[in-house]
Amino acid sequence: MNELHKAPSKKLLAVFAHPDDETFICGGTLAKYASEGVEITLVSATRGEMGRRMGNPPYINRETMPAIREMELRRACDTLGIRHLTFFDIRDKTVEFVDQNRLIGSIADMIHEVDPDVVLTFHEKLGGHPDHCAIGKATTAAFKQTEHKGSLYFISFGDMMKQPERYGYTPKDVVEIDVQAHLEAKLAAFRDHRCQTEIDEWVWEEDQKALARFGSYEYFLKGSPEVVGQQRSDLFLVK
């Protein structure tokens, strides 16, 4: 195709709370879209410095943890194909306590800057951790505030959204992404987050045994009007 007539790159903005959220929850999906040429930008609100895992045996401490977790996240981004990484420099476990208007404004600025087709974040009630819920709530508010033309989705843990009725949703509210072809990248990114995964023996088993622990699909809850009710297996709308 002539360079002048190439279709513009699709863009995805992921706004999460901690290093490793991108890998542990939706690493297969991010690797899939990166391999298809999607330009991915990741925001990590914190550096995860209050995490309790210090390696196995422990090799880091509270003072060295922020730098090490940032380094490990950068490696995971390279592994998954995430092109851009931004930190909001919020202290871990305090996202819900920062000035929310300022946080929403920072996320809105990122949305304007990146102009993403897809925004990923946590569900404000199903995030499973106060930081997750807080960043999800702020991102949802920023998405609405900007009246952005893209689509908003909420990430979900494991296969919890295989039965969305348990959470007040229906199968039509869920997008199911086949990540089977990208599990090797997901496993490699797990291993990049060394200080967080060394205690999990299965991550470091022979590759085929470790890969067998992953599901073949990752699930996303639709969060914006233009995608609600559409049964799909892709986060990007056909234009």
Question: Which residues does each predicted region cover?
Answer:
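Active-site rim/loop-helix segments in enzyme catalytic domains that contact anionic ligands
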Residues: 1-114, 141, 145
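Metal-dependent de-N-acetylase/amidase catalytic core
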Residues: 2-13, 84, 93-239
